[in-house]
């Protein structure tokens, strides 16, 4: 998938599929699938490193995981999150951070928020030829300011703010916008108001595409079960079953067998 395919898919009313990915083996699997695009999300701090929030993601962490995913990925378009405070200092520092992610293999960056400074930064990056994906609604990097993980845009004032933010991000040059944890009617209204595509997570079926976290949709963990996640596989259960089978065969001397020995 190429950058121009995002807008084309919206025009042709073809849904966009996006999935997070954090390592080389997973990227190799994704490469053999029909997934359109991959996000090396700052959720890696939680899903892989065990931190309680995405705020703990660093530019070094994002760079390392982007390199790993890029080595294994195929035709999918690769986007990487600019981590917490990665664009809140000088524009020069922001460009340097983005440069590191692009050199690591990212084809675009995703930036959370739509305040004046953020939109100016996005415009600066886009004018420099760097594709940027926006992100509104529940923005995990602002979790403390938002008062926790909860649905955004539930009242008319918040809804109007999100509509304005989406329009501002489009004007700033974003090629797509993630809408997270927003009522489905509002997400559909935002989607219909934009020329660029929207990617939803917890935003209903009316967005131009969907994104889920690898570990959530494959059932690799069972402690985090938000309403918007559908588990397409019970990986954790199958992994435990395989591990216990290995232990049993070792204890009963069924492994290694002759075919596993020299």
From Swiss-Prot:
One example GO MF annotation: magnesium ion binding
Record-given protein name: 3-methyl-2-oxobutanoate hydroxymethyltransferase
Major subcellular location class: cytoplasm
Keywords of the record: Cytoplasm, Magnesium, Metal-binding, Pantothenate biosynthesis, Transferase
Gene3D superfamilies: Phosphoenolpyruvate-binding domains
Cellular component annotations (GO), alphabetically ordered: cytoplasm
GO BP term (any one): pantothenate biosynthetic process
Pathway(s) of this molecule: Cofactor biosynthesis; (R)-pantothenate biosynthesis; (R)-pantoate from 3-methyl-2-oxobutanoate: step 1/2
UniProt source species: Legionella pneumophila (strain Paris)
Binding, 3-methyl-2-oxobutanoate: 42-43, 81, 110
Membrane-crossing segments per the record: none
Entry annotation: catalytic residues: 180
């Amino acid at each position: 998938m190429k950058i121009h395919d995002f807008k084309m898919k919206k025009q042709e009313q073809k849904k966009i599929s996006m999935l997070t990915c954090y390592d080389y083996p997973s990227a190799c699997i994704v490469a053999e699938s029909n997934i359109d695009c991959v996000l090396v999300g700052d959720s890696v701090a939680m899903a892989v490193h065990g931190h309680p929030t995405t705020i703990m993601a660093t530019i070094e962490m994002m760079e390392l995981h982007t390199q790993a995913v890029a080595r294994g990925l195929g035709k999918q378009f690769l986007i990487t999150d600019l981590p917490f405070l990665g664009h809140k200092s000088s524009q020069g520092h922001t460009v340097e951070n983005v440069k590191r992610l692009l050199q690591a293999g990212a084809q675009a960056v995703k930036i959370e928020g739509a305040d004046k400074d953020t939109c100016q930064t996005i415009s600066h990056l886009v004018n420099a030829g760097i594709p940027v994906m926006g992100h509104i609604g529940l923005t995990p990097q602002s979790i403390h300011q938002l008062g926790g993980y909860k649905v955004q845009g539930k009242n008319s004032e918040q809804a109007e703010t999100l509509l304005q933010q989406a329009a501002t991000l489009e004007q700033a040059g974003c090629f797509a916008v993630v809408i997270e944890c927003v009522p489905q009617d509002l997400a559909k209204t935002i989607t219909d108001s934009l020329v660029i595509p929207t990617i939803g997570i917890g935003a209903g079926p009316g967005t131009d595409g969907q994104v889920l976290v690898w570990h959530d949709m494959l059932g690799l963990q069972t402690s985090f079960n938000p309403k918007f996640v559908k588990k397409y596989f019970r990986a954790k259960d199958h992994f435990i079953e395989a591990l216990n089978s290995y232990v049993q065969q070792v204890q009963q001397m069924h492994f290694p067998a002759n075919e596993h020995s020299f």
